[in-house]
Swiss-Prot record:
GO terms for biological process: exocytosis; zymogen activation. Plays a role in neuronal plasticity and the proteolytic action may subserve structural reorganizations associated with learning and memory operations. Residues 93-165 form the Kringle domain. Disulfide bonds join 93-165, 109-149, 138-163, 195-259, 208-269, 239-249, 305-369, 318-379, 349-359, 412-475, 425-485, 455-465, 525-589, 538-599, 569-579, 619-750, 661-677, 765-831, 794-808, 821-850. Residues 29-88 are annotated as: Disordered. This is Neurotrypsin. It comes from Homo sapiens (Human). It is linked to Intellectual developmental disorder, autosomal recessive 1: A disorder characterized by significantly below average general intellectual functioning associated with impairments in adaptive behavior and manifested during the developmental period. InterPro entries: Kringle (IPR000001), Kringle-like (IPR013806), Kringle_CS (IPR018056), Kringle_sf (IPR038178), Peptidase_S1_PA (IPR009003), Peptidase_S1_PA_chymotrypsin (IPR043504), Peptidase_S1A (IPR001314), SRCR (IPR001190). Keywords: Disulfide bond, Glycoprotein, Hydrolase, Intellectual disability, Kringle, Protease, Repeat, Secreted, Serine protease, Signal. The gene is PRSS12. Brain and Leydig cells of the testis. Glycans are attached at residues 26, 683. It is an enzyme of class 3 (hydrolase). Residues 56-71 have a biased composition (Pro residues).
Amino acid sequence: MTLARFVLALMLGALPEVVGFDSVLNDSLHHSHRHSPPAGPHYPYYLPTQQRPPRTRPPPPLPRFPRPPRALPAQRPHALQAGHTPRPHPWGCPAGEPWVSVTDFGAPCLRWAEVPPFLERSPPASWAQLRGQRHNFCRSPDGAGRPWCFYGDARGKVDWGYCDCRHGSVRLRGGKNEFEGTVEVYASGVWGTVCSSHWDDSDASVICHQLQLGGKGIAKQTPFSGLGLIPIYWSNVRCRGDEENILLCEKDIWQGGVCPQKMAAAVTCSFSHGPTFPIIRLAGGSSVHEGRVELYHAGQWGTVCDDQWDDADAEVICRQLGLSGIAKAWHQAYFGEGSGPVMLDEVRCTGNELSIEQCPKSSWGEHNCGHKEDAGVSCTPLTDGVIRLAGGKGSHEGRLEVYYRGQWGTVCDDGWTELNTYVVCRQLGFKYGKQASANHFEESTGPIWLDDVSCSGKETRFLQCSRRQWGRHDCSHREDVSIACYPGGEGHRLSLGFPVRLMDGENKKEGRVEVFINGQWGTICDDGWTDKDAAVICRQLGYKGPARARTMAYFGEGKGPIHVDNVKCTGNERSLADCIKQDIGRHNCRHSEDAGVICDYFGKKASGNSNKESLSSVCGLRLLHRRQKRIIGGKNSLRGGWPWQVSLRLKSSHGDGRLLCGATLLSSCWVLTAAHCFKRYGNSTRSYAVRVGDYHTLVPEEFEEEIGVQQIVIHREYRPDRSDYDIALVRLQGPEEQCARFSSHVLPACLPLWRERPQKTASNCYITGWGDTGRAYSRTLQQAAIPLLPKRFCEERYKGRFTGRMLCAGNLHEHKRVDSCQGDSGGPLMCERPGESWVVYGVTSWGYGCGVKDSPGVYTKVSAFVPWIKSVTKL
C-alpha cells in the first residue's frame, strides 16, 4: 500500500484505529455551520417554549474542487432502487415523507448531481443511482438507516448533515373535530403556520390527502390573534391539488411583514362521517401534565395496558390532550393502579397520529393484563432546566440534553462521574443508570449548555449539581454525555461495588483509573495490572470492545489516596469490586505507579510505504490531532500527535537502550537529527537503534517499533568543536522505502523549501521530545509551543557563534522560559503551514543552559540544507 493510498484509506474510515483524522485535514477548510446557520428569512412570530427555526438561505456557488470536511456515513452495501420520480424508498425518509430536502438544522439540501466529486470518492456501486439525479431529497445511499444530504455553507464549502424526516408533517389545530382546523406545518423542529394569501381548495385538498382525511378539502381562514406566538413559514402556496405532500407544492418562504387580513390557512376535510376520538384523561399524577392514562368508552372509564407502550404512544396522548413539552411513557402502574376495565392493549403508535384511535392496537376490551400494568404518561412543560435523553431507542437512553432559553442543548463529559449519572436517571424516574458510549447515538447539532458538572449523588434534580455557567465550555459534540438508565431489578443494578471513572485521557474511553471509596476519589496501584483488569474496568463503564492496561502513571499521576493494590481479575468479573482481594488503602506504591486503561482499543498496525511521488502530498499530517485545548499551552503531548517524532537510542547488552537524542522521520527509511549526537559514541551503526511510534518510554505499545541503523551521514562541514552544520541523516535498516511501517502514529514530516524563511510562512511552532521538564526527564513525550525570533536576538546574544545556517527560537519573558531543553538534542522544531501540514524547520542544536533569561535556543536551519538532504536521501 502506498502512503497516498494509506492516507486515503484513513480519510474514508477504512482503518478503525484512526480517530479524528477528518477534523485534522479539513477543519480549516470546511466547518459545519450547525452552530451558526447562515442568515436567511425572518420569522416574526415564534413560540416562547420552542426552538426558533434556524435561518437558512440558498447555498452559495460550489467550490471548484470541494472536499468533504468529515467522513461520510459509514459505507454499507445496499442495492439502490432506480427511478426518476422520487417515491418512498427504504433508503430515504419513510413512506409518506420521502420529499424532505432540508437538514435537521434547516439548511437546504444540494442536488445530488451538483456534488459528483464527493460521489467519485466512494465505491461506485454504492452511489451509482444517485449520479446525475437532479432532485435534492434526503436519502441514505449507504444503507445507514438515517437519511442525509449535502448542503453548502455560507463560505461556499460543502458539508453533509442528517435530515429530519418529520419536516413537512402537517396537523390541524383548534377545530371542533379532527377534520378541521388551522393548518400547522412541522419544520426545523418547530410547528408553525401558513399565511392564508392565495390559499384555496386545491391547497386544502393536499393537506387533507396528506392527513388521510379524504381527497377533498375546503379552504378556510383563522385569525392569527387566536393562535398566540407561532412562526409563519410559507405564503402564496400554489398546489395543483394532486400532490401527495405540501412540500411538493410551489410556495414562497415567508419573508416577514404583515399577512393579508392577518389570517392563517385552515381547512375542513370532506369526510361527512369520521371516527369519533375517545375521551382521555390523566389520573393519579401530581399535576395535570402527568398520570395514568384512562379512556372513556362504552359509558365507562378504563385503563390501557403497558404492553409495547413507549414514548411514541405518549406523544400521541399528549397531543390529543393539547399538552406540549416532553412526552414520556411510564409502565407498571407508575401512577398507581386504576379501577374498572382494561380498555386497550398492544398500542403501537408511530408518534404522528392525532389520536390514539388512529394507532394500531388491540380490539376494545381485548387484553391479557392486570392493573399492575396500567400505562401512564407525562407531558412535561418545557421550562429551563428540564432534561431528557435523546437519540436512543426510548426515553431511557440517549444523549443527555438540557432545555434552556427555548433550545435543547447537550452536556460536556469533562469530569463526568457515575454519581452524575445516578442523579440524572433518578430525576427521569429510573433507579439505576450508566454512562453510555457516545458513538451509540448521533451527535447533536445544537448548543453545548453545561460543562464540568459535579454531583454528590444526593441531589434530587440535575441542576442542583455544581457546574459552569450556562453556555461556558471548551468541548465539542464528540464529548456529549450519553446515558442508559434502567428501571431497577437485580439485572439492571449499576451499583456494582465502587463508582469508577477515567481521568486525563485524550477521550472518555481512556485514562487513569480512579475509584470512589469512603467519599473520596483515589487511584489504583499498577502492581500486577493486566489487560484482564482493564477489561473489567471497561465493562463496568459500559464499553464492549478490546481493553488495554497501562501502567507507570501513563496518563499522569493522580492525587489523593491510593485506594487499591494488587488487583487480580480473571477478565470475566462484572465489576472491579469482584477483583479486590487486599484491604482498601493497603499498598506499597506511589502515584508514579497509577494504573490506567484504554477501552474500545483497536490497535492494528497499518503498513504502508512512502515513495517519492506521494511523499510531498501527504507528509506532515497529524492524523490523531484532537481537542485544541489539550495542545495549546500543554506539556504532555497527544499520543500519536507527533507521528514523525522518533528517538535515537544507544544500544546496550540488556536490550533496553538509553535515549540519546531526538530525531525526525522524513520517509520510511530516513531520519533527520543533529550531528553532535554522534560526537561521544562515534558513528558506528552497530551502536545505535531508532525507535518510532514511541510515547511512554517505559511502556511498549502496538505502534512502537525499534529499527537498526544501516548508515549514518554527518554533514561534511561539521566539526565537533563548533556548532555550525550541526545536522545528520540516519538510514534505517530495511529494503528500499520499506523500513518503518506507517500508521496513524508513524508518519513523515514535511521538508521546507530551499532557503524558505519560516518567519514569513510558518505559525504555531512546537518543539517535542522527552527532554528536561524542570524536575527530571520525562517518561512521556513532551511538547512546548515556542515562538520564532528574529535572528538579531541570537546575533546579539551569541555574537560570532550564530550563523546564517541557524534559527533562533524561544520565549524571552521571565515567566515563560521555554527553549530547546524541553525538547531533545536532534529533535524537531515543527511549524504549521497554512493548510495544516507540519514542516520541520529546525533541528535542536545548542543554547546557554536551560531556560536562562535572554538566552533563546538555537536550531539548525533545515531549509539551508534541503539540497544536501535530497541528494543523500533521493527524496
